Each structure stands twice: as C-alpha cells, then as structure tokens.
Amino acid sequence: MDLLFGGDMNTLAQAFDLGLQNTRTERPSSTPFRGSTLGGCLRAQHYAATGVEPSNPFEPRLYRIFEQGHVIADVLYKKLEASGLFDSIQFEVPVLWEEKNFSGNIDILVKWKGESTEEVLELKSMNSRGFTYLKGPKPEHAIQAASYALCREHLTGQPVAARVVYVSKDDFRIAEYTVDREWYDKALRVLDVGNKFLEQGRIPWRLPLAEGQDVSKRWPCAGCQWLKKCRG
C-alpha cells in the first residue's frame, strides 16, 4: 500500500482543503474593531479594517484548525443545551457597539437556572498538552470575552459575567476561568486607544521587540497575515 501525497493524483486531503475554502463563511467586519482580534495587535486590526491585502495569507492548515474549533464549539453547545442547567442558551450571538466601532460574535450566551445575570462563554480549543501550562485565561482571550460582556452591558443596562472556556481537542477536557472586572477595564482602554488612532487617521504603532528577538516566533507577530507588510 502506498501513502498518497498528491502530485498528479487526486487526494481527499486536496478535496477537503478545497471544500473548506469554498464553504468558509468569512464574517465581514462591519466595524474597525472586533472581539476576536481586540486583544492582539492594533496595527493588524487597522490593516484588516482598511482592506489591506495580507502579505502572509493563512495556509490551508490553519483553516483546518479553525474548522476543528467550529466543530468542537457546535458539539459543546448541543450538550450544554441538553443539560437542562440553563434558563436560556444562545449560540453565535452577534453584538454591535456603534459608538466604539466594535462588533463580534459571542460563542455562547447563557443564563444559568435561578440566575438573573447573563454570562458570556468564550470557547477556545487546544490539545491536551496545552492544559499543563494553563494558569488562567490568556490575556487576549480574557479581553475578547470581556469586550463581548461590555457590549451586552451597554445594550441591556445590566451586569454581564464572562468566562473563558478551554476545551481539549483530544478528549473534551474542560478548563474554565471567570473573567475579572479588571479585564473589562483593559478591553475598554484598548477600544479607546484604537478609536483615538482612528479619529486621528494614524496607523497604530508596531509592537516593540527585544533586541535579537525572532519576530517569526513572537506572538502575535508569528501568525500575523500582515507580517511582511509591517516588519518588511
């Protein structure tokens, strides 16, 4: 038996990647700032918002990872819905805060039984090894969840809780962390700074690098679609 790598022969791997490409539904950004990128680099958000062509487009492998995340989120939502522990549960809830030029999609929005407060659940998938290093929510994930909660608070006038939920791609192990109020303040500050650049028509600064640091191995530069555009 031969292992197929492609070349002149059709492969399922090629068909799968093409299917992902043809069925992927991009969420067009209606605003300059989105929750999914707010905790990252403001300069990259500027490039995305102004339609700058990516100098480092995503590879097919990353789209497979994104799709896997969607599958895990869908399974988790269905099982949570079937648990009977929630008065309400909604999947993929859009949010918009026009005054802050902000929008996004909440993974899951719930009200636990007997609770009056809404809670934002921000889901992140990772392999089981990653759980070894988890000490709390990653800053970019905490800011994302907090920004959605802030948006709901602005809409409803009521306090909204937030939680970052990590799910193992290997065995559905779950680690979950409530998001402290300080992250709400940080998310709001990022929005205010980003909007200040927007008002002034300026491109946000590059993130600083330590001397000798390899930009291709530094988050968030390593996975940035505009790395060459920004760093040259």
Region annotations inferred by a language model:
Residues 1-120, 129-133:
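Metal-dependent nuclease catalytic cores that hydrolyze phosphodiester bonds in DNA/RNA
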Residues 4-6, 135, 151-232:
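Metal-dependent nuclease catalytic regions and adjoining charged, substrate-binding loops involved
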Residues 41, 148, 224:
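A residue-level signal for conserved active-site and pocket-lining positions in enzyme catalytic cores
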Residues 68-72, 144, 183-186:
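Short amphipathic alpha-helical segments
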Residues 74-82, 112, 136-166:
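Metal-dependent nuclease catalytic cores in nucleic-acid-processing enzymes
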Residues 90, 119-122, 161-166:
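A structural signal for short, well-ordered beta-strand segments and their strand-loop junctions
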Residues 101-104, 140-143, 147, 186-189, ...:
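Residues forming well-ordered secondary-structure scaffolds
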Residues 127-129, 170:
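Feature marks short, surface-exposed loop/turn motifs that line or immediately flank catalytic pockets
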